[in-house]
């Protein structure tokens, strides 16, 4: 039932939610943040539920056979299996949200996309500002992608400590 509820915010694109919220709340960053947050909750809910379904129950059963409580079974049997995927998906959504925020800003939701739209007024000669904004956006996305990629590799190679994974 929860999974079906999370399908609703995931099914509606951020841009549609943002445009409705801009109409209701006015322009600015708040409608964009709400739109991105709703879509992210839906997407991560689906991804996390699939990770949970694919987790092996054998460690949990083994821990139960030696008298471990529910918390111990989850902490030692489930979390080590799902934490790397949770973190990987969260980092992926962070990258997606950066891109989405630029697009939503372009349609009037504030932020760097809004600045980009304002500088792209043809005929005012602000091409250097527009190019600088494009470059900053590109470099930000590449930097976040590289950092999250390295972090994901650390997790999947087993080099990350338990403190980092949690």
Protein language model features and the residues they cover:
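Generic hydrophobic transmembrane alpha-helix motif, especially the helices
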Residues: 2-37
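Alpha-helical membrane-interface segments at transmembrane helix boundaries
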Residues: 2-9, 95, 117-120, 124
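Hydrophobic alpha-helical segments of membrane proteins
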Residues: 12, 16-20, 82, 86-94, ...
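Generic transmembrane alpha-helix signature in multi-pass membrane proteins
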Residues: 16-21, 50, 61, 91, ...
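Glycine-rich helix-loop "coupling/hinge" segments at transmembrane-helix boundaries
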Residues: 23, 100-136, 156-163
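Membrane-cytosol interface at the C-terminal ends of specific transmembrane alpha-helices
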Residues: 27-78, 84-93, 146-149
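C-terminal transmembrane helix and the adjacent membrane-cytosol boundary/short C-terminal tail
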Residues: 88, 131-166
């Amino acid at each position: 039932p929860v999974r079906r509820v999370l399908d609703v915010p995931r099914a509606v694109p951020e841009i549609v939610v943002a445009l409705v919220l801009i109409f209701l709340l006015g322009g600015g960053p708040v409608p964009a943040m709400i739109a991105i947050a709703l879509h992210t909750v839906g997407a991560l809910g689906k991804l996390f539920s699939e990770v949970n379904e694919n987790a092996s129950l054998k460690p949990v059963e083994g821990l139960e056979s030696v008298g471990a409580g529910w918390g111990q079974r989850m902490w030692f049997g489930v979390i080590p299996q799902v934490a790397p995927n949770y973190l990987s998906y969260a980092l992926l959504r962070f990258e997606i949200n950066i891109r989405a925020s630029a697009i939503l800003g372009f349609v009037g939701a504030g932020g760097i996309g809004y600045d980009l739209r304002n500088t792209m007024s043809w005929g005012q000669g602000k091409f250097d500002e527009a190019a600088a904004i494009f470059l900053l956006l590109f470099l930000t996305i590449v930097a976040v992608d590289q950092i999250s990629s390295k972090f994901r590799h650390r997790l999947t190679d087993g080099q990350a400590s338990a403190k980092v994974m949690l």
